[in-house]
Curated annotation (Swiss-Prot):
Subunit structure as annotated in this protein's UniProt entry: The complex is composed of two ATP-binding proteins (FecE), two transmembrane proteins (FecC and FecD) and a solute-binding protein (FecB). Interacts with FecB.
Organism: Escherichia coli (strain K12)
The family this protein is said to belong to: Belongs to the binding-protein-dependent transport system permease family. FecCD subfamily.
Protein function: Part of the ABC transporter complex FecBCDE involved in citrate-dependent Fe(3+) uptake. Probably responsible for the translocation of the substrate across the membrane.
Pfam families per the UniProt record, alphabetical: FecCD (PF01032)
Membrane topology according to the record: Multi-pass membrane protein
Resulting phenotype, R288C: Retains 65% of wild-type citrate-mediated Fe(3+) transport
Entry keywords, A to Z: Cell inner membrane, Cell membrane, Ion transport, Iron, Iron transport, Membrane, Transmembrane, Transmembrane helix, Transport
Gene (UniProt): fecD
Induction: Induced 1.3-fold by hydroxyurea.
GO molecular function: iron chelate transmembrane transporter activity; transmembrane transporter activity
Transmembrane stretches, start-end: 3-23, 56-76, 106-126, 138-158, 180-200, 226-246, 270-290, 295-315
Gene Ontology terms: biological process: intracellular iron ion homeostasis; iron import into cell; siderophore-dependent iron import into cell
Subcellular location, principal: membrane
Name used for this protein in its record: Fe(3+) dicitrate transport system permease protein FecD
Length: 318
C-alpha cells in the first residue's frame, strides 16, 4: 500500500508538472513541450523564462515546507505545530519585507539569510513565551505572535507607500514573476537541506516515545532538537524568501501523510516531500487558470485548503 501510494503521488506530480508547463494564458502545445526548448522556437521564452522557473520553485518549496512541518511536529510532538502556525513564516516575512522596503537594492541572494534570521528570532521568542510543548498553548501563542509580526509588516508597508507594490505582491505568497535568479539561490539550498532531514529519522522516531526514553536509547535530545529545528527554520525561511509566506502546507501535508503512512519518519519524510510538492504545483496551476488573464496568489489557495483543516484539528483535540 505504501509503495502504491508513492507511485500514485509521483505519477500525479509528473502529470501536474506537465499540465503546469502546458496550461496558462498562452497555452503551449503538447508537441512544443518536446521541441521548443532552444532559443528561436516559438514557445521558448514562455517555457524557459516563465513556466519552468516557477515550476521548479513550486516543486522544491512545496517539498521543503512539508518536510519542515514534519520536523517541527516531530520535535515538539505536536500535530498542530507547523512553520506558519508557530509564526516562523510571518517572522521571516517581516525580515524580508523590511529588507525589500528599506534596502530595495539589496541582492536577491541576501534575502534567504535575512528570512532565516527573522524566522529563528520568531521561534526563540515563541519558546520563551510558551514555555511548554502543550499543543493548544503553542498554537495559540504562535497565532498571537503571527498577528504581531503581521502588524509590524503592515506598519512597515504603510510607512513606505512608494515602495509597497513589490512587497504587497510578495506577501500574498506568489510564484508570479519568479525567474532564474530566485531558482539559482533557493534550489541549491533546498537540494542541500532536504537530504539532511533524513538524518533525523531515527532520533525523531525515538523522541515520539518521550524525552526520558529517547535519552535512555542514546538520543541527545537537546542536540537533536536544536539541529532539526535549525534545519526546519532554514527550509522555511528559504521558501519564504523565494515565494513569500505560503500557508498551511507545513500543517496539512504532514498530518495527512502521518494518518496514511504512520509515524515512521523514514517513510513520512519522503512521502510528505512529494505531497507538498504536488500540493503547491496544483495550487499554482489553479491560480493561473481559475480567472485568466488575472492570476490569484498561490498563498490564497493553500490557505483555503489549510484553514478548515486547522480548525478541524483544533476541534478534534479539545
Amino acid at each position: 500500500m505504501k509503495i502504491a501510494l508513492v507511485i500514485f503521488i509521483t505519477l500525479a506530480l509528473a502529470g501536474c508538472a506537465l499540465l503546469s508547463l502546458h496550461m496558462g494564458v498562452i497555452p503551449v502545445p503538447w508537441r512544443a513541450l518536446l521541441t521548443d526548448w532552444q532559443a528561436g522556437h516559438e514557445h521558448y521564452y514562455v517555457l524557459m523564462e516563465y513556466r519552468l522557473p516557477r515550476l521548479l520553485l513550486a516543486l522544491f518549496v512545496g517539498a521543503a515546507l512539508a518536510v519542515a512541518g514534519v520536523l517541527i511536529q516531530g520535535i515538539v510532538r505536536n500535530p498542530l505545530a507547523s512553520p506558519d502556525i508557530l509564526g516562523v513564516n510571518h517572522a521571516a516575512s517581516l525580515a524580508s519585507v523590511g529588507a525589500l522596503l528599506l534596502m530595495p537594492s539589496l541582492p536577491v541572494m541576501v534575502l534567504p539569510l535575512l528570512a532565516f534570521a527573522g524566522g529563528m528570532a520568531g521561534l526563540i521568542l515563541l519558546k520563551m513565551l510558551a514555555k511548554t510543548h502543550q499543543p493548544m498553548k503553542l498554537a495559540l501563542t504562535g497565532v498571537a505572535l503571527s498577528a504581531c509580526w503581521a502588524s509590524l509588516t503592515d506598519y512597515l508597508m504603510l510607512s513606505r507607500p512608494q515602495d509597497v507594490n513589490n512587497a504587497l505582491l510578495w506577501l500574498t505568497g506568489s510564484l508570479w514573476g519568479r525567474d532564474w535568479s530566485f531558482v539559482k539561490i533557493a534550489i541549491p539550498l533546498m537540494i542541500l537541506f532536504l537530504p539532511l532531514s533524513l538524518s533525523f529519522c531515527r532520533d525523531l522516531d525515538l523522541l515520539a516515545l518521550g524525552d526520558a526514553r529517547a535519552t535512555t536509547l542514546g538520543v541527545s535530545v537537546p542536540h537533536t532538537r536544536f539541529w532539526a529545528l535549525l534545519l526546519a527554520v532554514a527550509m522555511t525561511s528559504t521558501g519564504v524568501a523565494a515565494c513569500g509566506p505560503i500557508s498551511f502546507i507545513g500543517l496539512v501535508v504532514p498530518h495527512m501523510m502521518r494518518s496514511i503512512t504512520g509515524g515512521r519518519h523514514r517513510r513520512l519524510l519522503p512521502v510528505s516531500a512529494l505531497t507538498g510538492a504536488l500540493l503547491l504545483v496544483v495550487a499554482d496551476l489553479l491560480a493561473r487558470i481559475i480567472h485568466p488573464p488575472l492570476e490569484l496568489p498561490v498563498g490564497v489557495l493553500t490557505a483555503i485548503i489549510g484553514a478548515p483543516w486547522f480548525v478541524w484539528l483544533l476541534v478534534r483535540m479539545r
